[in-house]
Regions:
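Acidic, glycine/proline-rich Ca2+-coordinating loop motifs
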Residues: 1-404
Length: 404
């Protein structure tokens, strides 16, 4: 939770859950907690909990709760070298070097301003500052983690909101797709098999999302190739599009391209994997053709076979409590300057527009197109949603959804 206690719910069966957060010792101390990963970090057969921490205020150290086997946990991040202090959004564990243990990729979102010019992003990209880069940690033989970010070739500035791990070029090695916010380009790190990675985002894709949000990787057409969904913030209806689409500004778009970044558009991308050329995966963005290009202020895309027909369907959570991209709001703020703007900052923030919206769930039609299925599947909720996860919570053979 963000500056509120974390929650751990014990599944008692029959869709009944018990809050054991305090008794288990995982409630935390009101840090700005972001992503949570459950992983058996010490190979004892028990699930541990790794919680990423962001925000502007200390303490900002990630926490690792080791499972004691009796429904209690002991915080041990420092003992494992996992006490990162950057502004980490989410951590993903995977075996990038194929040595039989799990390593960690930490998606970092360093502090920035939404009005930061592209020339500063360009400068930061080449500054090679570890505190402003995603991080790669290699697990050592003794179970501790060592930072190998620079040695692996991924010391780059970015505003990461998510990272998806998959073998995108079918060479048996796990690669990394990093979704970055604002003008900072995404990264597609291909695993070279020697402990290093090479960014191939421009070679592999024609364009990406502008406000890169959540991602998920899956084979949507059962051709044996891993595809990728990346969500952005484009609304379906014309009114909300015009009110909230910053990238409708041509000057902003071309300043991004001319700064050496990628072609980025404020729409979702569904990257269909068409195979490889000399080891580089080639993607075609089919989001519009597939019917999934605009899902409003989206956060978490999840591919899963919700109707058990053999094809991966798509769930997308969306919503924002305050619409900080609203063009009309910005015009109002720009009329006020200097000390007056500072004095009225709280009042202005409270006046930001807000509009609850529905999540999206799409049925995979089996032909690389999707159909919205909210009503057919009785999954409509008008509100403000962020994270989501799926699993068979009642052991009935189908997938259930938890939405924050």
């Amino acid at each position: 939770g963000n500056m509120v206690p974390n929650k751990l719910y014990l599944n008692k069966g029959n869709m009944i859950f018990e809050d054991i957060s305090d008794a288990a010792g995982v409630a935390g101390d009101h840090r700005w907690y972001t992503g949570t990963t459950m992983i058996d970090i010490n190979n004892d057969g028990l699930l541990d909990i790794y919680v990423s921490v962001s925000g502007k205020f200390a303490p900002r150290t990630n926490q690792l709760f080791i499972n004691n086997g009796d429904l209690t946990f002991t915080e041990s991040a420092a003992n494992y070298g996992l006490d990162a202090e950057e502004e980490i959004i989410q951590t993903t564990f995977f075996d990038y070097d194929q040595d039989g243990d799990l390593d960690a990729f930490l998606a970092n979102y360093p502090s920035t301003s939404f009005r930061t010019p592209n020339v500063k992003y360009q400068f930061l990209k080449y500054a090679k500052d570890l505190e402003k880069s995603d991080r790669l940690l290699e697990q050592q033989a003794d179970g501790t983690f060592k930072d190998v970010t620079e040695a692996a070739g991924i010391l780059n500035f970015g505003l990461a909101i998510s990272a998806s791990i998959a073998d995108f070029n079918n060479d048996g090695l796990e690669d990394i797709y990093v979704s970055n916010d604002f003008s900072t380009p995404d990264f597609l790190y291909l695993n070279n098999g020697d402990g290093t990675f090479t960014d191939k985002i421009k070679e592999s894709t024609n364009q990406t999302a502008f406000y890169g949000m959540g991602t998920d990787a899956a084979d949507i057409n059962n051709d044996g190739l891993i595809d990728l969904m990346q969500v952005d913030m484009a609304a379906q209806d014309n009114r909300r599009q015009k009110a909230n689409m910053a990238s409708m500004n041509p000057e902003l778009f071309w300043s991004t391209v001319n700064a050496g970044f990628h072609h980025q558009y404020m729409y979702n991308t569904l990257q269909l994997n068409r195979g490889t050329v000399n080891g580089t995966p080639i993607f075609s963005n089919i989001a519009f053709a597939a019917g999934v290009a605009s899902t409003d202020w989206s956060w978490c895309p999840l591919f899963a076979d919700f109707d058990n027909d053999g094809y991966k369907d798509l769930f997308i959570s969306n919503g924002t409590r305050k619409e900080v991209n609203n063009r009309d709001y910005f015009k109002q703020v720009d009329k006020i300057s200097g000390q007056e703007q500072l004095d009225q900052s709280l009042a202005l923030s409270l006046e930001m527009p807000e509009e609850p919206i529905d999540n999206y769930i799409f049925k995979n039609n089996g032909n690389t197109t999707f159909s919205k299925a909210n009503e057919d599947w009785s999954l409509s909720y008008v509100g403000f949603s962020n994270g989501a996860a799926y699993g068979d919570l009642d052991n009935d053979g189908d997938l259930d959804l938890v939405i924050n």
